[in-house]
Amino acid sequence: DPQDDSLLMNIANSYSAMGEYAKADAYYDRALTFNPDLAMAYYNKAKLTKEKKEELWKEKCMAYLNHCIKIMPYFYDSNINKAALLREDNKNAEAAEVLTNVIEPTFRPEFIMAILQRGIAYRLIGKMPQALNDFNTVLLYQPHNVQNLSNLSVAHFSMGHINEALYFAHIGLDEAEQQNRHDCDAEFNEVINRIDAMSHTIVRTQ
């Protein structure tokens, strides 16, 4: 009888490939008795559970994925599958957060800050398309970056993108409130007030 977690995993994977899911599941469990921190065993059990779709399969699959993520936080596949399960239940905001947790660490924070600072430089010399490219890149990796949300709002306003400017101003203020970081509030409020003044001017001239 195999007494080695690697060998047990290989046997389990072989059974899984042949479609013998019950035997595969049993061998993954045995591997976990030898090594409770075997993240891939939890991940593979999640895949089996999803494949079989038995009673409460979503709950079981999520539990296995959470075990895997606890051991290997930045294992992309487990996070992607967790996000997919959340989206199936229309929990899109939670799904976005799960994916953000693996996207953010992809690059060093200093690298992202350099892109943000270059975007600010572009914005200040009027190169708005280039600035927007940099700000959107930062948004991809750090969607909660208040300074970047401020620059996105200002850049969109400068380019005449009123809806986008207002959108980023409002979510920026919400994010600032959550983080208790208010150094960009003046910029957010200026964009909102200027758009509000523009809308009143349009109403008066009609």
Per-segment meaning from a language model:
Residues F34, I71, P105-F107, Y141, ...:
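Structural marker of alpha-solenoid helical repeat scaffolds
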